[in-house]
Amino acid sequence: MSKEETLYSVKVDQERVPLFDEDFYKGFRSELSVRFTMAALDPRAKSNDAVTVNVITRLEHPEEDGEESDEELFQEEKFTLCTLKKGSVYQQPIDIIFSPGEEVFFERVGGDIPVYLSGTCIITNIPEEEDSSDLENDFLYGADEFSSDEEEMDDISVTSSEEEEEENGARIEELNSDEEDAEQAEEEILEKPVPKDEVAEKHSKDKLKKEEKEKKTAVDVSDSVNGKKRKTEPAGEGEQTEKKSKSTKTYPKQVLEGNVTVQDKVKGDGPAAKRKKRVSMRYIGRLTNGKVFDKNITGKPFTFNLGLEEVIKGWDVGIVGMQVGGERTIHIPAAMAYGSKRLPGIPANSDLVFDVKLLAVN
């Protein structure tokens, strides 16, 4: 794991200023930490009144039993960062770090003077192997952590076809092995001599088995007439098989505006995402080399108004038409993403790939 730092500053000139401006990261939350080391007044300001900068943090507080509720609870905390005054205290050294996941705002109180907070943006680079492991554990199996139909997600289909074939092959071999063991055990039992005092009991059991076999044969014959073959399954196994068959169905790729390409992995059955609707999403963002640069797979879903340029153009185009419960892969050309702008973890002129799932439409 490596780290790199870039210069970063915030101008506090309103009552409530966010840590990250929307234009800085276009609605996507990044795995970034920010450390501020200096607060300074604008020397051109005319006001001589003292000005105070407060910090407001908004942290998520899950319920005591560890499960998330339908409406997640949040609590705001406020504290004073510094107080400056023109003519006496133009700047003040500070040392404060905001970690990834914190929702932070700055509040200006007092004089009508802009205050500049400066420092560094700390970027943590996670090795691909470690990131891939986290992705498999959280993204594929994170569904058990959510209970709400609107805000919780099933596991997203990101397993490759080769892995599915290997898994299916392993299961087939295991089933064949179990059947061979059962047949061998049955042959061994038949070969063992039966004591005379057990002959009557065995005869009774054999008679019951014969009757059961005749009943089963009758059922199989009845099903064969309708072109079906019944198979005894444990409770719930049929539903799981149907769900897996649905998730592995292949849908055609579609080329949309700006050469944005989408391919559905799972078709949803809920309300459809339309322009000007507010949607809640889970997602994993990758570069074309497979490296993950951003993701939202746990906690509060990523929510925005579709088609109103609150996110990159590729999302406004690629999400339209999805239904709640649906999963989709979106390939976005650089021109429909961040273009020539370089962002933490995203080189300039990068094509992006997103695996997304639609949780809710409001």
UniProtKB/Swiss-Prot annotation:
Name this polypeptide is given: Probable peptidyl-prolyl cis-trans isomerase C27F1.06c
Phosphoserine modification, residue list: S69, S177
E.C. numbers: 5.2.1.8
Catalytic activity: [protein]-peptidylproline (omega=180) = [protein]-peptidylproline (omega=0)
Lineage: Eukaryota, Fungi, Dikarya, Ascomycota, Taphrinomycotina
Source organism, top-level taxon: Eukaryota
Listed GO CC annotations: chromatin; nucleolar chromatin; nucleolus; preribosome
Function: PPIases accelerate the folding of proteins. It catalyzes the cis-trans isomerization of proline imidic peptide bonds in oligopeptides.
Biased segments, Basic and acidic residues type: 190-218
Compositional bias segments (type: Acidic residues): 146-167, 175-189
Enzyme class: isomerase
Disordered: region residues: 144-274
One example of a Gene Ontology biological process annotation: chromatin remodeling
UniProt keyword list: Isomerase, Phosphoprotein, Rotamase
Residue ranges of domain PPIase FKBP-type in the record: 276-362
Residue stretches spanning the membrane: none
Pfam families: FKBP_C (PF00254), NPL (PF17800)
Organism: Schizosaccharomyces pombe (strain 972 / ATCC 24843)
